[in-house]
Amino acid sequence: MSATKLTRREQRARAQHFIDTLEGTAFPNSKRIYITGTHPGVRVPMREIQLSPTLIGGSKEQPQYEENEAIPVYDTSGPYGDPQIAINVQQGLAKLRQPWIDARGDTEELTVRSSDYTKARLADDGLDELRFSGVLTPKRAKAGRRVTQLHYARQGIITPEMEFIAIRENMGRERIRSEVLRHQHPGMSFGAHLPENITAEFVRDEVAAGRAIIPANINHPESEPMIIGRNFLVKVNANIGNSAVTSSIEEEVEKLVWSTRWGADTVMDLSTGRYIHETREWILRNSPVPIGTVPIYQALEKVNGIAEDLTWEAFRDTLLEQAEQGVDYFTIHAGVLLRYVPMTAKRLTGIVSRGGSIMAKWCLSHHQENFLYQHFREICEICAAYDVSLSLGDGLRPGSIQDANDEAQFAELHTLGELTKIAWEYDVQVMIEGPGHVPMQMIRRNMTEELEHCHEAPFYTLGPLTTDIAPGYDHFTSGIGAAMIGWFGCAMLCYVTPKEHLGLPNKEDVKQGLITYKIAAHAADLAKGHPGAQIRDNAMSKARFEFRWEDQFNLALDPFTARAYHDETLPQESGKVAHFCSMCGPKFCSMKISQEVRDYAATQTIEMGMADMSENFRARGGEIYLRKEEA
């Protein structure tokens, strides 16, 4: 923890300095590479970790080395991970997908914004200082057209986005030749289909079947295509967002960039404070990853925080506002039905979802059915016009392990399955949100229920937390559950930070949450047997056994922390080549002893072989040349 707490002014100044001086930055001894596709402009970024050679023999004067292959890894940092790209947050990122969107010819630019709220914000001169300068002219589908990746997939069309994803998901593993690195234990996939090589056609087929989604609003052309589905790599979402009492636009942009650096596949902007609209514009124009929101939060702000005053009209206006800004997926709590609310009465912790509690309060105060459920088809029509994916929210998720897997939770899940089928009628992409707080022995049922009742739509869970006793460490308690449910088939894990249940996360909390969840996602990929998932582990183990300390640091998810921990006790440069660490010291290092045993065994084998040959030579009479019949 930091010894001195910064003031609000200092925090904003630091964040402003961060974005003013932002440059593309590579991780230590890594370089950005690109793999091109067949579609024009498909140029898929990856990070390649360069490794040092292995000493295999020779003398001190003339050592002999064997090269180690560079390790390609999935990279979510976009232009921020390429030192060759000039970064200007004021101008935003390059519009990677714009030519692909335009080439399809099924969209049109809007001359007037559809949202009354957006019109009012644009007309307010007092917001000029906060406004992103290069506001995008939004597009929507032409009349009678649908512009979703699901629509294209069902038509048999392989889009550039799909080819981009196929290359990205393969992670350049075809470049790896070493059998040691390619070795992988068989996994247990629980019914997931994990092909050795992911093709663009496989991506198209998974999207067409509804088993995967590509969150890619036509008004967020800056985003790099990615996919969420159980037959692909497990993904991680990071939540950011300001509140009424803390954080600023500068800090949220800083958190966005920071999140993508540490591996966030998507980012949700959960802002509830002032300037939600302006904050979101800055985030979208500078985000290389899909952005999700919970529109009910902003709709509530528009009615001064009074849930009973919410209306369909205010909510619809918010959907249009956010869709035209470029939000890639909406969390919609349409499954919180009036008849389900009494089911939560006997719970220990009631309704803990913000969106769920808002809708429950509205339903009870009006004694009417949830207006999101009533107007769900209209929501789908809006999403189909911009390609906004739906993340059907679990407003009745359990907030304690005592409430796990109860009647209310699964009643809502079944309704989400019904809504999924309706969304698919409109070619709208759907994923399903899940819990929450669930003890380990009850986790798998959540996955099997979701697959059965939600028709294999991708599952997206918050953890789940496996115990409730560790405030301040809930990234651990939830990381355990996340690894398990990812193994069982969950497609995306929403990170939990150390501040969960305690406060709004800062930059360091975001990093801690992401590292924890990248570990969980990777562990799930290994357990499922995802092809190529073990390459980085094998490279790390090989570097560890060969005492290549620099390579160990650089292969780590967090190279900086790995190096810092090592250097706390062995800070000298000699410690980076030593055949031991400070835990065991030079006399008791198990790997050093293993190497000595291996060398000794090899020497003994040679000596025994020589002795056998000598004995054989004497047994044959000591003749240098053997007769033909003896040879």
Swiss-Prot record:
Cofactors (names): [4Fe-4S] cluster
Residues involved in substrate binding: 239, 268, 297, 333, 353-355, 394-397, 433, 460
Assembly information from the UniProt record: Homodimer.
EC number from the UniProt entry: 4.1.99.17
Name of the protein in question: Phosphomethylpyrimidine synthase
Annotated cofactor note: Binds 1 [4Fe-4S] cluster per subunit. The cluster is coordinated with 3 cysteines and an exchangeable S-adenosyl-L-methionine.
Originating gene: thiC
Family listed: Belongs to the ThiC family.
Native source species: Escherichia coli (strain K12)
Keyword presence, Metal-binding: yes
